[in-house]
From Swiss-Prot:
Protein name listed in UniProt: DNA N-6-adenine-methyltransferase
One Gene Ontology MF term: site-specific DNA-methyltransferase (adenine-specific) activity
Catalytic activity: a 2'-deoxyadenosine in DNA + S-adenosyl-L-methionine = an N(6)-methyl-2'-deoxyadenosine in DNA + S-adenosyl-L-homocysteine + H(+)
Organism: Haemophilus phage HP1 (strain HP1c1)
Keywords: Host-virus interaction, Inhibition of host innate immune response by virus, Methyltransferase, Restriction-modification system evasion by virus, S-adenosyl-L-methionine, Transferase, Viral immunoevasion
Top-level taxon: Viruses
Family: Belongs to the N(4)/N(6)-methyltransferase family.
EC number: 2.1.1.72
Entry's Gene Ontology BP terms: DNA restriction-modification system; methylation; symbiont-mediated evasion of host restriction-modification system; symbiont-mediated suppression of host innate immune response
Functional description taken from the UniProt entry: Methyltransferase that methylates adenine residues in the ssDNA and dsDNA sequence 5'-GATC-3'. May prevent degradation of viral DNA by the host restriction-modification antiviral defense system.
Length: 173
């Protein structure tokens, strides 16, 4: 049974990442991100960022360690872009995505990522674009996907972290 979203269409792709999720990813992967590839001025996690108007699918990525929380309505082109930036341009990319094993983009992650960290026991309370507050309206589980240059094909590592542990560790930053 599919869970229907109650999010207004105008906000569907605009929810921001809580800081503690971003900090956890930096800590877990031992990365200091220098580019936020899908952001707006009011919600970027890094000084260097790409806006929707600049279009991360075509823009030059001026960073080596890239954070990406893409629009969830159509993640496939963003997954493909992250893979190509990693393979062709020597970028390390961490994506925050829904867990949906029935999709082509999920299969692309499994085939190309170095590691996938599944977030368990709850769902990320993303930041509502209108209110700036964490929301409990997220209807799908999430995962962190790490793409690294020269990661050997078929070397995927799967890891798990509870949302509670992620928040606890991420808030220490």
């Amino acid at each position: 049974m599919m869970t229907k979203s109650n999010t207004k269409k105008s906000d569907k792709d605009l929810w921001a990442t809580p800081w503690w999720v971003f900090h956890y990813a930096e800590q877990y992967f031992n990365i200091k991100f220098d580019l936020d590839t899908c952001a707006m001025e009011h919600n970027t996690k890094v000084k260097n960022f790409i806006t929707p108007e600049q279009n991360t699918l075509t823009a030059d990525w001026q960073g080596r360690y890239c954070w990406m929380n893409p629009p969830y309505s159509n993640p496939l082109p963003f997954v493909l872009r992250a893979i190509s930036q990693s393979v062709l341009h020597n970028k390390t990319v961490v994506m925050l995505l829904n867990v949906d094993g029935s999709t082509k983009w999920f299969d692309m992650c499994v085939r190309n990522a170095k590691e996938i960290v599944y977030i368990t026991n709850s769902r990320i309370p993303f930041i509502n674009n209108e209110t700036g507050e964490e929301t409990d309206q997220n209807n799908k589980p999430q995962m962190l996907v790490l793409f690294e240059p020269k990661a050997p094909y078929g070397s995927l590592k799967s890891s798990y972290v509870s949302l509670h542990e992620m928040k606890e560790k991420g808030m220490l930053q």
